[in-house]
């Protein structure tokens, strides 16, 4: 991996269907005090004219907190998407989707700001982000 790689992620990222464009509001699944996250950009996307950058499971995004503790609001935080409603295909051929879109707030190195995650974490995300996998209750 190059010097300017993905923060604290490890391993190769496979192509999955991107279900969360810029402007999407996702649930915050950690115990930082944030209720939801508003995606303002996606890390590592070069882009095409008039195309909205979109994120999928395991992507790092820049997000703001729309509902939650006042200390967290009106600031830009890095976050990692851990669940998405849009179905995506795994290498073994199974299609998988979750009942909500969710992310967790991290720092630039990929270490979680909170200490617990509510709900399952996608296996693709857990493989990429070991610091998130260690705090996950269940990995699906």
UniProtKB/Swiss-Prot annotation:
GO biological process: translation
Entry GO CC: cytosolic large ribosomal subunit
UniProt modified residues of type Phosphoserine: 17
Top-level taxon: Eukaryota
Alphabetical list of Pfam families matching this protein: Ribosomal_L14
Residues with Phosphotyrosine modification: 38
General function of this protein: Component of the large ribosomal subunit. The ribosome is a large ribonucleoprotein complex responsible for the synthesis of proteins in the cell.
Keywords: Cytoplasm, Phosphoprotein, Ribonucleoprotein, Ribosomal protein
Coiled-coil residue spans: none
Protein name: Large ribosomal subunit protein uL14
Keyword DNA-binding: no
NCBIfam families reported in the protein's UniProt record: PRK08571.1
Keyword Nucleus: no
Listed GO MF terms: large ribosomal subunit rRNA binding; structural constituent of ribosome
Family that this chain belongs to: Belongs to the universal ribosomal protein uL14 family.
Subunit field text: Component of the large ribosomal subunit.
Subcellular location: Cytoplasm
SUPFAM superfamilies given in the database record: Ribosomal protein L14 (SSF50193)
């Amino acid at each position: 991996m190059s010097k300017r790689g993905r923060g604290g992620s490890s391993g190769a990222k496979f192509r999955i269907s991107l279900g969360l464009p810029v402007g999407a509001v996702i649930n915050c699944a950690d115990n930082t005090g944030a209720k939801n996250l508003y995606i303002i950009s996606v890390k590592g996307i070069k882009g095409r004219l008039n195309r909205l950058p979109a994120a999928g499971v395991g992507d790092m995004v820049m997000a703001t907190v729309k509902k939650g503790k006042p200390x967290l609001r009106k600031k830009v935080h890095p976050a990692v998407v851990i669940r998405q409603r849009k179905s995506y295909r795994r290498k073994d051929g199974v299609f998988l989707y979750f009942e909500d879109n969710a992310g967790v707030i991290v720092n630039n190195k990929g270490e979680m700001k909170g200490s617990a995650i509510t709900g399952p974490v996608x296996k693709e995300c857990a493989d990429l982000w070991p610091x998130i996998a260690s705090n996950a209750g269940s990995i699906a």
